[in-house]
Curated annotation (Swiss-Prot):
EC number: 1.3.3.3
Organism whose genome encodes this protein: Vibrio cholerae serotype O1 (strain M66-2)
Coiled-coil ranges (or none): none
Taxonomic lineage from the root: Bacteria, Pseudomonadati, Pseudomonadota, Gammaproteobacteria, Vibrionales
Keyword terms of this UniProt record: Cytoplasm, Heme biosynthesis, Metal-binding, Oxidoreductase, Porphyrin biosynthesis
One Pfam family in the UniProt entry: Coprogen_oxidas
Protein name: Oxygen-dependent coproporphyrinogen-III oxidase
Catalytic reaction equation(s): coproporphyrinogen III + O2 + 2 H(+) = protoporphyrinogen IX + 2 CO2 + 2 H2O
GO MF annotation list: coproporphyrinogen oxidase activity; metal ion binding; protein homodimerization activity
Gene that produces this protein: hemF
Residues with site note (Important for dimerization): 182
Amino acid sequence: MKSNIDKQAVKNFLLQLQDQICQQLEAADGQAQFIEDAWQREPGEKLGGGGRTRVMRDGAVFEQGGVNFSHVFGEQMPGSATAHRPELAGRRFEAMGVSLVMHPKNPYVPTSHANVRYFIAEKEGEDPIWWFGGGFDLTPFYPFVEDCQLWHQTAKNLCAPFGAEIYNEHKAWCDRYFYLPHRNETRGIGGLFFDDLNEWPFEQCFAYMQAVGEGYTQAYVPIVEKRKNTPFTERERQFQLYRRGRYVEFNLVLDRGTLFGLQTGGRTESILMSMPPLARWEYAYQPESGTPEAQLSEFLVPREW
């Protein structure tokens, strides 16, 4: 598996993907632009490297969102990582990726998340250990069946060239991963999720990661365009803020990437970029039966689209 590994090609793609996604989301918003915060790790820190954090605020469509590129490296993996993968002990490592979350203002536009990443751990005289990961998922507040079908059909189409079962496997993985056991519900309607992908040749794994990265806006932008001008009232806004609380719960309690980043001295501002600007909690809230708010629960279980 050592041959044909091209770290620079992966990095070049990720930088270009960040540019492309930002341009497409700015066009969908029509008003706000991403502000870039380029950062570098200080010498002597646990991790070296840097990245480009891009944040959009107070747009016509997006209340807040971020599209982050990072490329970090270290001389050895943290103990939290090698406990489950002892073969990584004593290896220097690099991790690079693009991660994004968009929180729309209009409750009829779903929140979306996407991430693609590459990891490699190397040691003199031994084959490198590498893998790709990523995916995208959608969190509607007032879901429409046709939007969910478009989202999943886009995912299914991009998976098709890589194997008949890839969509089913990575959809099911997404449903399992974005699940809140303390609420007994999924975070949203899912999409794709994969990790530790290295069983194919490097070029094929890289091509799949590229397809997933580029598939995000193909799936999301048409939904944004369709829903962004839907009228809404304070009632829908309050429900959106309440449901955003679930997003916060998942990210701070369950998300592996958030926990890993905070435990390993990652850049806190970039890690917490995924948080919504406003959210609320209400004790023992139950939506009135028969209302659109009550219907959301029907979508928060794994199902075929």
